Amino acid sequence: MGIKLINIGFGNIVSANRLVAIVSPESAPIKRIIQEARDRGMLIDATYGRRTRAVIITDSDHVILSAVQPETVAHRLSTKEEVVDEVDE
């Protein structure tokens, strides 16, 4: 099992092995998680000033803001896993 990298928009890449959740930023609990991460210094803003469309939570409690849709990030993750599985066979 190697390192899998996922593009989260604008050339920003995160390790797929570290992802815990990819969620929409619209709900109050997620907004609270974003604010708490900002206060702790654990927020990474990868939106380049654009609207936040996906919030990525990692196993190290970092919260990453992305300007691409959660479905797009999830699709990139599943596509990457399929390609790796085909190479392993």
UniProtKB/Swiss-Prot annotation:
Name listed for the protein in its UniProt record: Putative regulatory protein CLH_1161
HAMAP family named in the record: RemA (MF_01503)
Membership in a protein family: Belongs to the RemA family.
Species assigned in the record: Clostridium botulinum (strain Alaska E43 / Type E3)
